[in-house]
């Protein structure tokens, strides 16, 4: 379970590029797991700063998404991950320039970029990004779990 932010400005979504896990090479939303004794808001602020370099100016909860993700581990074994995401609408603090992405052991992203919503497609976006696009367009999130298969094809 993790907390993630949807940040849209001028028709573009702020996304990160994943370097490990089932979404390797894909765009994903900034966010991640809470640390012990960390509130949801504290976690999303920390994750945004670590992964994008931006401080968040405003927050409002949107809802949750529920995914089952099939993928192939580096040892070629298949795995099923149950991913529960708590989503927040976020706005970056435009009064402060973005810092560089924080590098640390376990960092799972390599860059943060603003991508036009029209350019984010299934082929290079995580399920969270796809749900974010649907939410921006419709104002609603699905109530049922979705299943995605990223297993390596023989």
Q: Each PLM stretch: what is its role?
A:
Residues 1-13, 85-89:
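Conserved N-terminal beta-strand and adjoining loop/helix that marks the start
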Residues 22-25:
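A conserved beta-turn-beta hairpin within the catalytic core of GNAT-like acetyltransferases
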């Amino acid at each position: 379970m993790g907390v993630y932010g949807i940040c849209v400005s001028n028709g573009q979504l702020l996304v990160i590029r994943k370097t490990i896990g089932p979404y390797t090479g894909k765009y994903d939303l900034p966010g991640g797991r809470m640390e012990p004794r960390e509130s949801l808001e504290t976690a999303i602020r920390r994750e945004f700063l670590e992964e994008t370099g931006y401080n968040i100016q405003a927050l409002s909860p949107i809802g949750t998404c529920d995914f089952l993700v099939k993928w192939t581990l580096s040892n070629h074994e298949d795995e099923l991950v149950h991913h529960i995401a708590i989503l927040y609408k976020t706005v970056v603090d435009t009064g402060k320039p973005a810092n560089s992405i924080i590098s640390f052991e376990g960092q799972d992203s390599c860059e943060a970029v603003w991508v036009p919503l029209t350019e984010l497609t299934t082929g290079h976006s995580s399920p969270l990004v796809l749900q974010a696009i649907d939410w921006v367009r419709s104002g609603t999130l699905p109530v049922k779990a979705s299943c995605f298969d990223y297993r390596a094809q023989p």
